[in-house]
Amino acid sequence: MKGSIWMIGDVQGCCAPLEQLLAHPDLAGDPDARFWFAGDLVNRGPQSLASLRRIIGLGERAVAVLGNHDLHLLAAAAGVRKPSKSDTIGEILQAPDADDLVDWLRHRPLAHFEQGHLLVHAGVLAKWDVAKTLALAGEVQEALRGPNWQKALQKMYGNEPVHWKEHHKGGKRMRVIINALTRIRLCTPAGHMEFATKVPPGAWPAGLMPWFDVPGRATRDITVVFGHWSTLGLLLRPDVICLDTGCVWGGSLSALRLQDRKLVQIKCSQFQDPLAD
């Protein structure tokens, strides 16, 4: 199937499985194939720098949306946050071409829509349709690509506000957009984000549900493709696709062909303990 789009889950610095995936006959055999990356290209895995270079090397064949770990790298580059012990982004920050790598990353989108599929890292708020999602993502993209991008990143940390209001401005507006697109998992029935609860899928308390099950979600008529939720794992529904299958935790790196949902998975060695941090 020539000219296919392969949608790929969280790489998180696991370059060896990424190389195996790209070398798989179904992917490597199509010189016109394109690759969608669901964010979190770097961090936690052993080869963040190599992973980033590999994806950049794909040129226009790759579409990569920003994930929370990618934004964390940008914040570290901006001096807004210091890397933690479990981070594996130091080699990127110390690379001789670090400025070029960071510049490439901060010019990535937070949302991409094509052929009825909306690609984001974590999810969308129930009130947002595709047009609204792309417009709000565009606001953050403009800030990250601008001359004051370091200052913009200072505003993104925090869990509030938990729901969308059109009159939000400044830091509040940026936080709710970034949190929805790169951090969301659980919501209330009213669509308010909830970040404190960390339980296995299906064990969430009454009054909470996955963001994609909030009643009346405005994107239910298209397919939202996301990663971010490794404990949820592979999820294939007509309206949502989750592709984070826990590569860095010893799961697999997954690619799904958009046109027919053919699945290719590469088994990964465990690099970090998901319960350790």
From Swiss-Prot:
Protein name (Swiss-Prot/TrEMBL): Bis(5'-nucleosyl)-tetraphosphatase, symmetrical
Catalytic activity: P(1),P(4)-bis(5'-adenosyl) tetraphosphate + H2O = 2 ADP + 2 H(+)
Taxonomic lineage: Bacteria, Pseudomonadati, Pseudomonadota, Betaproteobacteria, Burkholderiales
E.C. no: 3.6.1.41
SUPFAM superfamilies per UniProt: Metallo-dependent phosphatases
The species this protein was found in: Bordetella petrii (strain ATCC BAA-461 / DSM 12804 / CCUG 43448)
Family named by the database record: Belongs to the Ap4A hydrolase family.
EC class (word): hydrolase
InterPro entries: ApaH, Calcineurin-like_PHP_ApaH, Metallo-depent_PP-like
Annotated function: Hydrolyzes diadenosine 5',5'''-P1,P4-tetraphosphate to yield ADP.
